[in-house]
Design a protein with these regions (language model features):
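Hydrophobic structural segments
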Residues: 1-250
Length: 250
């Protein structure tokens, strides 16, 4: 399948006006316009995921994050390796967080939540969180276990009340700011799930009386990238889609 056709398909999945207004939140870097037979996806663009793409002869990488400028030299290294091996790359940051098939929405649905509200507004445009409800309330340790099974990693959790958990705010990835937690509190949620925390996250959750669950940034967000890649597979059945291995290092 021609890369340009895959690019058109992917871009059509997002709000065009938001993409135009925030070009810093996404990119599609084409290495020519040859055929693409294999797509690899990961949360992060790192030397390790690029190496996985090279090893598996991937023609297009899809990630949630670009390589970070503040990890000095890493972005240049990744760009050089992609160019060297003729691998195209696209990333969608806030647009994927905002999408109904994106990071927080997909994690919420995977946990069995019925989404009832959007939350966690960023840049006055992108709703990066989702509030959902369980059909039947669950206990604290039950939710923690479900999240650990889903993410395949330990989940840190802080219990601030003894009520069963019915209503949950999910802000996958970097929802560590106290204003993110406040969105969950203002949304009358019993629990808040995210992928990063600081002292302030924990202290405010305790003060506000909301149960806090923290997985990793990488693996709370992978389900949205997986959904994006699956949509490419649905559109182009002949394309092979694979998950690129990422380590649990957080």
């Amino acid at each position: 399948m021609k890369l340009s056709e895959v690019q058109t398909c992917i871009l059509s999945l997002f709000d065009a006006e938001k993409l135009e207004r925030f070009p810093d939140e996404w990119a599609f870097r084409a290495a020519g316009d040859g055929d693409v037979s294999r797509v690899g996806y990961a949360t992060n663009l790192t030397p390790e995921t690029v190496e996985e793409a090279v090893r598996n002869e991937v023609g297009l990488m899809i990630t949630h994050h670009d390589a970070w400028d503040f990890l000095y030299g890493m972005k240049e290294y990744c760009m050089g390796k992609l160019q060297e091996h003729g691998i195209s790359h696209c990333f969608f940051h806030l647009p994927l967080d905002d999408a109904d098939f994106g990071t927080s929405a997909s994690l919420a649905k995977a946990l069995g939540l019925r989404i009832v509200e959007k939350s966690n507004l960023y840049r006055d445009t992108f709703y990066c969180g989702r509030i959902g409800e369980f059909n039947a309330a669950v206990e604290f340790e039950c939710l923690r276990g479900s999240l650990e099974n889903l993410l395949g990693e330990p989940v840190r959790a802080w219990k601030s009340h003894d009520r069963p958990i019915k209503r949950v705010c999910v802000a996958a990835g970097g929802g560590l700011m106290t204003n993110d937690v406040k969105d969950a509190v203002d949304g009358t949620c019993d629990a808040y799930i995210t992928g990063e925390k600081t002292l302030y996250t924990v202290e405010y959750a305790r003060f506000a009386g909301i149960n806090l669950f923290v997985g990793s940034h990488t693996f709370t967000e992978i389900f949205g990238v997986e959904n994006l890649a699956a949509k490419v597979k649905d559109r182009f059945g002949d394309i092979d889609v694979m998950k690129l291995k990422e380590d649990h290092i957080e």
